[in-house]
Curated annotation (Swiss-Prot):
Origin: domain of life: Eukaryota
A Pfam entry, by short name: KRAB
Subcellular location, record wording: Nucleus
Keyword Zinc appears in the UniProt entry: yes
Keyword Zinc-finger on entry: yes
Reported function: May be involved in transcriptional regulation.
A GO term, aspect molecular function: DNA-binding transcription factor activity, RNA polymerase II-specific
Keywords: Metal-binding, Nucleus, Repeat, Zinc, Zinc-finger
Organism: Homo sapiens (Human)
Stated name of the protein: Zinc finger protein 695
Amino acid sequence: MGLLAFRDVALEFSPEEWECLDPAQRSLYRDVMLENYRNLISLGEDSFNMQFLFHSLAMSKPELIICLEARKEPWNVNTEKTARHSVLSSYLTEDILPEQGLQVSFQKVMLRRYERCCLEKLRLRNDWEIVGEWKGQKASYNGLDLCSATTHSKNFQCNKCVKGFSKFANLNKCKISHTGEKPFKCKECGNVSCMSLIMTQQQRIHIGENPYQCKKCGKAFNECSCFTDCKRIHVGEKHCKCEECNNIFKSCSSLAVVEKNHTEKKTYRCEECGKAFNLCSVLTKHKKIHTGEKPYKCEECGKSFKLFPYLTQHKRIHSREKPYKCEECGKVFKLLSYLTQHRRIHTGEKTFRCEECGKAFNQSSHLTEHRRIHTGEKPYKCEECGKAFTWFSYLIQHKRIHTGQKPYKCEECGKAFTWFSYLTQHKRIHTGEKPYKCDECGKAFNWFSYLTNHKRIHTGEKPYKCEECGKAFGQSSHLSKHKTIHTREKPYKCEECGKAFNHSAQLAVHEKTHT
């Protein structure tokens, strides 16, 4: 075999592609390049064609090595000359399909080249395993998307709505949404969208195409995001867990064998749906789903449940017991699932993304609620006044206006509230605590939602628009009040004289006339 060229073991990036890498990825690149260089030198291969890389970078060999060892940015040196030379030359296109681009990890490219060179004596780093471990530790890293931002910085700002984005692609999506244009139309169902990606995904649903297949479990998906979520399940701590015996397996194939053994032992089958169980007691519990039977009743409020664990969880509402504590901030929860969701606040993980606007959430329920903003769906309707809500909890809270129920009482002044969060907010009046501060003007607030509303004064954002007259508002409550002008609704009634008002503030002023 001829002299080994540095290009055979090097992965090069253009200035534009270098900008897409985050600090951790750049650090990995430097470590690999320097170690491979030292390994080649130690084997006496210092006569290989190093001039390829160094000439492309328009600098001498010592300068580049010093630059990398000093952990400086290689593309900051001699920018004018390097701008004329794209180091990512045809050598990469020999190994990578054009449509893959940067979506090929460091490891895959390097392993291909090492195998091609047959370097049995050369001990090069096995970065496939290294990054596999790194990926498990760094949840935000995605080995198949080097351009994804792994930090929480938002360097791209929309000049229309002043929103910040960590990805340039998301900024482009935001700009298109402001124009109101939806040039992409699905030929099958006629749906329109402002993004071609959504239309591509839509068409895949119609034709049944699932191009993203998981090598671990064999599942196929029509969206890359769903494929990514599947991979996260496999690399997680409990990626292949058997629901029957709670054992965890390294591979899904091992899990499949165990699950098959469980299935063969299941002799108790439900006549209603065909599901099988290995214990008669489990089948009995399952049948309650079909019959609607709820034998476990709460002695406090009379609410019934079909399973005893559900009753146990419910009782914590009355006892205020919260056994699950966050190690990060000390906050406690009554359910383990609530703690799991809360932990994502600290990790910054937002795995649930809206296909319409690109906004991400740390809970699937929040995404479901958010989608109703785009669809305008309000499935929860008040039987008293007909008002509809996007979330069931909002309806429950609203009903207390009609019933007058205020179960949460302040121990300081005796004032009662319809919701526990209102009591928490009220308590800050006594303590004087205002933890939420505006970065623009320094004004502080005792509730985060007040800060969010206040920020719109600086940005000029008015996201809540009246469908009747087109008037826009910075707060949803202002829109709700405004709508009563069109509907002539007066839900706030004086108990003394029966006079009705469309705003609670007006009722409060009126009530003072009686006192």
